[in-house]
Amino acid sequence: MKKHIRTLSVVPLAALAVSVCALYPTKTEIFTREPTDYKNAAVRLTAPSEPDTSAENITDPKSAVLDKVLNTIDRLDHVCMTARTNMIGDGETTLTFNVDISAGLSHQSVAENGVTVSETYSDTNMGMVSIDHRTKRYTPDCLPVYTRSDTPYIPLDERITYEDGIPCYRYRRNITNCPLASYCLVPQELAFSVLSDTGSWEMSDEPVIHPDTGRSCVVITGVPSDYFAAKHGIDSFSMSVDEETGVILSFEGKKNGDVVIFTYATEFDTATETPVGRFDAAAFADYTPTAR
């Protein structure tokens, strides 16, 4: 997948606000999973230049939902989440996130077939450490870490703009510091991919209860763009959006009514202040540290 970018305001990989494993690349290989709907999209990353705000006064229901999905980080602090997805590897992957944004701590684990294959620990004071259990290696300071002060709110009309007919997307930094949070917890990429055209989807009139988490959510159904449909082999999609936070509790891409791609949350808790684990090098004495 080779893409060229027309405009890019921030170029160093270490400075990117989104994870290198995110599901939404633009015209560069910044993101390694999924391409955007729009082949010619450019990406913007916001520098910390203004205080954080929120847009609670959006009156259009669809725009309000889109804004909420793009800004989950404003409504999250303590969060524990587990989700299953087939959008990362060849099979099903289980993602677990434990985050305390105020404390600057997070832990992400990735499991395949019930076996944890990788972990990421983040501490805004100490940096981020990535652990690969398959190779028994760990990498200190594998990615930069961010706090709330690094990512001001961006008004919705500035998130998606067009230059010569080419859509340009502005991202906020992923302050959960979990590299795979883009699949559900900080789903900016997915929002840009399937929700930016508000004429292509509809949402439920009344909230429904998500069966696995018990959360009140909005159900969205729609038709993907031609590019997104061709990439994933789907002709429709549906998702459940947590009404309070905008987090994606489920996403399904379907072909002729059959599910092709999915992400399903099995746990989502924002009320319990679960202690977040920290990296302890002594626990990995038989692992090999590698340079970034």
Where are these regions (language model features)?
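Solvent-exposed helix/loop surface patches that form functional interfaces
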Residues: 153-204
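Gly/Pro-enriched, hydrophobic low-complexity segments
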Residues: 83-119, 127-129, 196-291
